[in-house]
Structures are given as structure tokens and as C-alpha cells.
Amino acid sequence: MSAPRRNGQLSSCEPCRKSKLRCDHSAPTCNRCVRRGKADLCVYHPAPLTKPRELSRPLKATRTATKEQMLVPAKTLKWDSLSASSPATVLTPAAFPNPSKLPFSGSGFLGPTSYSGAFSNSELDVVDLPSSTRSTPIDPQQVARGAQVLFLLEHLPLFAEISKKRFTISPGWVFGSPLMDQLFKVLEEVYRNATQDSGNKYARLLDLSRTFFKNTVTPIVTHESMTLAEYFSLAAPRWEMLSLLFGFAGTATYQLPPHSLGLEHQDEITSKEGLRQICIQASQTCLQFCNHLGTLSDPLSWAMVQHAIYLSHMHGSSAKTKQDHRTWQMLGDITTTVFALGLHQPDTDNTAPFFLKEIRKRTMVGAYALDKELATFLGRPPRICWRYCNIQYPLDMSYEEIVAEPAIRDAAIARLDPEGWNIDGCIDKGAKARARLAASIDEENALEISLSNRLDGLEEKVQKARKKSDELRRSLPPYLQWTEDKTDPQVASFHIEFLYHEFLLLQTLYKRVGKGIDDFVNKALEIISILLHMVSLETRSGQVHPTVILDLCYIGLPAAGTLCTELLRRSRPQASVATASPQTPFPRSDIIQKLSVFVAQLKTFARQQEGDYEICIKGERIISQALDRVLSPAPVGVVASSDDPWNNEPTGGDIGDTDFMAFLENFDWEQEMRLTFGC
């Protein structure tokens, strides 16, 4: 909440005060400003009716200039369990060093067709201007907003605990535990040194905010022998690193069971949603600071990838149901940043330490995979195309080995085969990153055919792409090849994803030229069968892995929709003979049984009030209704009772089979993207 005024009442934020609206005094921004889209303007002024003296007006010797009042941030977080900060006071802008100009980074990576291609390196060095000549103004109000964000570090132990619990589910391959642990360690020390034994915490946080701005515009100078601790001592106190912290903690609330968030004493939904809102606003604010400063750094690319994952969980991946395109917009920013950093080409930076080069590879793979999954889900052209990139496979090493001392690191490298895979058969090292890159390449091949408007030679292209997909899948090491006797859900997930790419190719062939219906149905049935097999294995173990649940919704629902549509079509008395293939009998009984089990599992594992729950439940009801029609056909002659069968939730014989078939064929079976690398 805001700092109290002299009369003891809480101050309103500036937008609410000027609009004469009731402010709820929430931090870092009030909820009313969030709803009105004025979160950027939401600040708390200690003396709103006072004005600073205009600089252009000459001062008389007999009068003393009044000091300009800085903006006061809110003192506490939204939920009651977190303690309040100490009362805040003001600080004069004179303490801000050079508030008008600060340096920012250059344009970044230049390719062979850029203007630099016409000059030699020595000529470019002559005309290159030092970064200190390039500057951008910093508004003192931005410093005050930064202090508001830094107030959240008072609750750093909560964010660290959430991060720790997140890594118990699955070791991250883009951002691993050693990276996040070091980030929390440095920030805890920075915050403690800035605020301990201080009677004026806000003044200290203003100074710390200035330090963060100064660090953010300062390039991170590295050397080949640099350690992770040394790197983070320079990189942690920057706004992009704070964005990564809040984005990671907020995303973890979607991956952890609600009871494990440490907020059991609060109302479950309110506490969880409150934490998510604070994290998303703080992460967004930090990225805005970086954008204002023109920052270009490795940590910025990390923060952007994590923020995009967070946005997808919170707002969805499309505008189909929530009218929100922020995830797609963020993907554009990620693409711009990784290209400017040159992550799409082999790393030639001789001053970068080993661990930083490997993190760069994983970041690029994460951006590439995100681009493919989002492009597939939305049916849009991908932004990062393989033909223009030379993306490197990360080494199959754990994060602990990547950041370890040279002796330990070299020993781990010695246990890699010539292709870079570990010879121990461990999937929890770097195998996920490498397999994700292979799967994303295959997905781009499927996209190239599916999004093309050319029909000539389509069947031949589809068969060629299917063969290439199978070869790519079989090129993975044996411990990533799925068989029914393997119980690792992540191995099954990679296998299902390759099958789904074939499913998309067959769907394109069938919808464009009406061929390959048998292969299309069989591929959908194969996907559903493997999914149900994995759910059964996981249920018996007592805990279903998040990857299985995501696959059940993201890949399973479109496949189930295909089976459902074809089942109903072939169950109609007037079904044409052309739809049935005499060589391949239609597995009607098997499809009905597996769809019935699929519906039950979907209803069980779809998380209420999160992500794609509404679309998921809608699809489940549609499949249930189709099964009812197949098993208990409606009387002949029943006509439609509504133009919108879903809004009226028809059951049994509410609408005719013809109308229901048209509705079923036009129903959007696509689910929210699963973002497997976020697990």
C-alpha cells in the first residue's frame, strides 16, 4: 500500500488522484490503473500539490529554492502475509549523477550484406564511435519506479523458494538451477548491503535503482577464464536480470501445485493470482527500462524468452479466445534481440567463457523452438527460419558441468560421443535442448508445406517430408527412442511430437486434395494410444508429469477431434462409399473405446481457471456429445434448434446430424501451445 499522509490516511496514486477516483493503494501499481491501462503512470507522490521550481526562472538571492520531491513507491505487497517496508522519504534529484545522458549499446550483429561488408575491419575501427558518445536521457521518475520494483526484493526468499521447488519437477535446460541460484545469491547480497542498518530504506533503494540503471547501460566485459560467480557479480544487478527473476518465479506458479507455493494460509486463487500479477508487472517494467535504455545483452535475451513463456501461460498464445496477442508480439522482440546478438550464427567471441557460449546456444534453441510452436499454433509464418541461420546444437552436458571448474568440465566433455551426445544415456543433461532443436527443425519442415498455397506435387512433398521426419527422429540416440517398455514421459513426449508433425502433414494433404484419409486417421489413433498409455503409467506411479498433461491437451485434443469427426461421418447412414477404404477396415470399436477414456482423462487433468481450461472443456463436451450420437443415434428427421449448437450445449437429439457434422468440422480443435522447454 502507499505511504500515509500527515493526516494518517493513505495516499492515492497520481492517476486516481487527478481523476478523482478511489485508489486501492496496491503495489507496485494499483489495480484500477492496471484495468485502465495506466500502469506506467501509477506512482505515489508524497506531496502531490507541491511543484518544483521551474529551472528557467531566475532565483533571487533572498529566497531559497525548494527541493523537488521524488515519487514515493508503495510500501507493501498485495497479500497480507508479506511484511511492510519501512516508511519512505524523499530525495533530491541533485543526488542523481548526470540525469540527462547515459550511454546505450550499438546496433549489434552485422551480417555479410550489411554496410560493414564494404569496409575492412581497420577502416571500421577508425570511424567507430565510443559508446560514451551515445546517450539516452533518464527520467528521475523512472528511477523512482525502479525503486518500487526493488522493494519487491524484500521478499526474495519467497521467490527463491518457488524457484527451488520448480527445479524439483524438472531440471531446466534453458535456465538451469546453478544460473538461478547464483542470481538469487548475488541479488540477496546486493539488497542486504543497500538496506541494512538504514532508517531510510527508500532513499537507499533510490540509490540502488540508479546503480541498476548505470549497470544496465554498461556492457558486460567478459574473459575466457571467467567464472559464473564473477560473471553474475557484474550481470545480476541489472534490470534484465530482475525481469528474468520475476518471469521465472511467475511462470513457476503455473508449473507447481498450488499447495506448494507457500501461500496455504491465504485464499488459494487470490494469493496465487496476486503473486502472478505482481511478477508480470515487475518483469514488464524491467523490460521497459531496458527498452528505454537501448540495452542489448545476453541477459536481456534470457529475460525476453522467459517473459514470453510467462505471457503464454497467463494470457494464452492467440487472440482466438482471449483477444490477446502479447505473446506473439513478444516473440518479435525476442527475434530482434537474438539476431542482433548474433546468436543465430556460430559463436566467434574469444572473450566469452565456456558456460556463456553454451547458454547462448540454449537461448537460441529456446527462441527457435518458441517460434516454431507459436507459428504452428497460430498458422503463421515463422520468424526464425533455419535456412538463414546456423544454429549450433548445445553439448549434452548438465548445467552443473557447464559452470564447473575446467577439470570437471573437461571430464564431462570427454564422456560425449563425436556428435555431442552423452554416452551415459542421461536425459536430464543437455539431451532435451538437442532433441528440442531436432524436433523444431522437423516442425519447420511441416510448416513449410502446411502454410504453402501451392498444390502441385503436394502428395509427393508430404511423403518426402514424412520420410525426412522419420529419419530425423531415428537419428536421436537410443535413450531418446520411445518404446512401450520405456516409462520416461519426456521420451514419450518427443516421440509424440514427431508423430504430431506427421499428423499436420497428413491433415494438410487430406484437407487440400482429399487424399490420405486412412493414414490421417491411423496417425491420430496412434497419438491417442500412446498418450493414454503414458497417462496410465503415470497414474499408477502416483503423480502425472506436467509434460503428459500438456501433451494430452495440446496434441491429444486435435487428434481426438479428427477421430471424432471421422467416426461420426462413417456412422451416418448416408455416408458415401468413397469415405471407406476396403483395404483398411475402419477401427470403429477401438476409436470409441479410446475416445471414451480420453474424455475421462481430459476432464480429470485439465486445470481449472488456468490457461486453456475453457477450450479444453469445450472440446471434451463436443467429443462426449459425438460419442452419444454414435452410440445412441438421434431419431431421423430431427432438425436444428439453434444456429449455435455450442452456446446452447446440445445433447442427444437437440440438433440434426447434418448440422452437428458441420459444427464439428468447423470446431477449432487447436489448443494452447505447450511450451515444453518451459518445464
Which positions does each model-derived feature cover?
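Intrinsic, low-complexity transcriptional activation domains
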Residues: 1-253, 258-266, 270, 326, ...
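Fungal C-terminal regulatory tails
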Residues: 294, 513-679
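Short amphipathic alpha-helical segments embedded in low-complexity Lys/Glu-rich regions
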Residues: 28-34, 47-51, 77, 350-356, ...
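Extended, leucine-rich alpha-helical cores of fungal transcription factors
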Residues: 138-152, 165-183, 228-250, 266-392, ...
